[in-house]
Amino acid sequence: MIFDYFQNHSLELIAVLLAILYLSLAVRQNILCWPAGIISSVLYFFIMNSAGLYMEAYLQIFYVLMGFYGWSQWKKVTNDSFVVNTWSGLKHFYAISFVLILSFSSGLFMHSFTDAALPFIDAFVTWGAIIATYMVAKKLIENWIYWFVIDSISILLFISRGLIPTAFLFGIYIVIIFFGYKSWKKILEKNNEIVS
């Protein structure tokens, strides 16, 4: 029975392992996070599409593109000069407004014209993830807070679609998020001390 489960979900399990590797390396500011994330995203494109989570499926294409962007951005910086940045409250207002407006409009579109499962929730986590991924590439500390909200909602979304290994992955993400935030906060504080 367990063997059958692994056989039927092998692609998802490989994607999960690569995604864990991605986030673990990102917490350590290791540039190898990006190729692991790219490969995981390619696999997840097919997984999400077959689960009827079309926004999540196409989000994976964005992740691949952002993976290459993040990889190129991080190549410009050595580990000794890894700089963590922060956004103003106004930028967060714009980002959150952007997510909410696009979530509603694309959720409405998906609800009206496709057989998408949970289109509004799918749209919200997709647009939120787009902003959060951009924030990771720009090394903004608040990315971890955005990911906490997105991943918490995603767990429920994936459970509802029977993607249990992926829901488990996002549970692991929730734990790693705390370590990532703490690690990046130390770097931000160190950067601020150097500037002062």
Q: Predicted segments — roles?
A:
Residues 35-39, 55-58, 145-149, 167-169:
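Hydrophobic alpha-helical membrane segments of integral membrane proteins
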Residues 1-28, 77-78, 86-145, 149-196:
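Polytopic alpha-helical membrane-helix bundles and their juxtamembrane interface segments
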Residues 61-77:
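Membrane-water interface of transmembrane alpha-helices
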Residues 25-39:
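Membrane-interface helix-loop junction between the first two transmembrane segments
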Residues 41, 45, 155-158:
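Solvent-exposed, amphipathic alpha-helical segments
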